[in-house]
Each structure stands twice: as C-alpha cells, then as structure tokens.
Amino acid sequence: MVDDSKKVWPTGLTIAESEEIHKHVIDGARIFVAIAIVAHFLAYVYSPWLH
C-alpha cells in the first residue's frame, strides 16, 4: 500500500473507489428514510390513538 500513491490510508481505497462506496451508502440511507416515512404515515393513518 505504501507503493501506490493513489491509495488512501487507512482503507487502502482510491478516491474514486471511496466516492463510489459513499454513493451507495447515501443511496441506501435515502431508501431507508423513504421506507421509514411511509411506515410512519401508515402507522398514523391506521392507529386511532394517534389522531
């Protein structure tokens, strides 16, 4: 890893590889938030004690 100047410590990934992984992590978080919003909306609609 010391030989390759494009790899970043401590992961050993290049900047492009880390940006690609970051994109997937952010996309996954957005999907999680969307599911959570739908779940909270459905809980509000179908729970009489929340009205």
From Swiss-Prot:
Annotated GO biological process: photosynthesis, light reaction
Cited InterPro entries: Antenna_a/b, Antenna_beta_CS, Antenna_beta_dom_sf, LHB-1/5, Light-harvesting_complex
Binding, a bacteriochlorophyll: 22, 40
GN (gene name): pucBC
Keyword terms: Antenna complex, Bacteriochlorophyll, Cell inner membrane, Cell membrane, Chlorophyll, Chromophore, Light-harvesting polypeptide, Magnesium, Membrane, Metal-binding, Transmembrane, Transmembrane helix
Subcellular location: Cell inner membrane
Membrane topology: Single-pass type II membrane protein
A single cellular component GO annotation: plasma membrane light-harvesting complex
Gene3D superfamilies to which the protein is assigned, alphabetical: 1.20.5.250
Residue stretches spanning the membrane: 24-46
GO MF annotation terms: bacteriochlorophyll binding; electron transporter, transferring electrons within the cyclic electron transport pathway of photosynthesis activity; metal ion binding
Species annotation: Rhodopseudomonas palustris (strain ATCC BAA-98 / CGA009)
Record bears the keyword Membrane: yes
Covalent S-S links between cysteines: none
Residue numbers on the Periplasmic membrane side: 47-51
A Pfam family hit: LHC
Function: Antenna complexes are light-harvesting systems, which transfer the excitation energy to the reaction centers.
SUPFAM superfamilies recorded: Light-harvesting complex subunits
Major site of localization recorded for this protein: membrane
Annotated protein name in UniProt: Light-harvesting protein B-800-850 beta chain C
Sequence ranges on the Cytoplasmic membrane side: 1-23
Similarity section: Belongs to the antenna complex beta subunit family.
Assembly information from the UniProt record: The core complex is formed by different alpha and beta chains, binding bacteriochlorophyll molecules, and arranged most probably in tetrameric structures disposed around the reaction center. The non-pigmented gamma chains may constitute additional components.
